[in-house]
Amino acid sequence: EDIDLIIVGSASPDYPGFPSTACIIQDRLGVMNAGAMDLLAACTSFIYGLETAKNFIAAGSAHRVLVIGAETLSRIANWNDRDSVLFGDGAGAALVVANNENETSGIIDSYLRAEGAGAKHLIRKAGGSRSTFHINTAEEDLYLKMNGRQVYTFAVRALCDTIKILCERNGVSHDEIKYVVPHQAN
């Protein structure tokens, strides 16, 4: 009852569009007064969810936001394509809560970027409005297609750049960082 908003980040939701996975979770938790939305930003959906939660709280629109990241990409992996089976299933959650003005804990900063030009390197062709599921859909279009080497190279470069930018922006040295929980660079 004390959750104001549920954000679920996933590239493999329970259903394609309706109902949202967040609404299913809202019902199961019995928090009927909470807003609920799915957020899709591929592998970074959970991070975008945290940033969205932070901004809802900063705007005063919410005080307690449940952010969930969940993937079951094994269900859409082409197990015959060695470049595309480097995924694992899993889920994690965080409760983001408005803190007192005197507290210094929480989300300090974030740096969100995307690589739209790389869409061809990680794609599932069927299932969207551009190419709906149909009896004549080519079987390979039902599965995730990935250029593993390209995706890995991009992810490692992006992570290194992001750490550098965030450290510079916040006056933090690399030595002061205790933990980095990175994206799984496949």
Regions found by a protein language model. Give the residues of each.
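Catalytic nucleophile serine of serine hydrolases
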Residues: 43, 71, 184
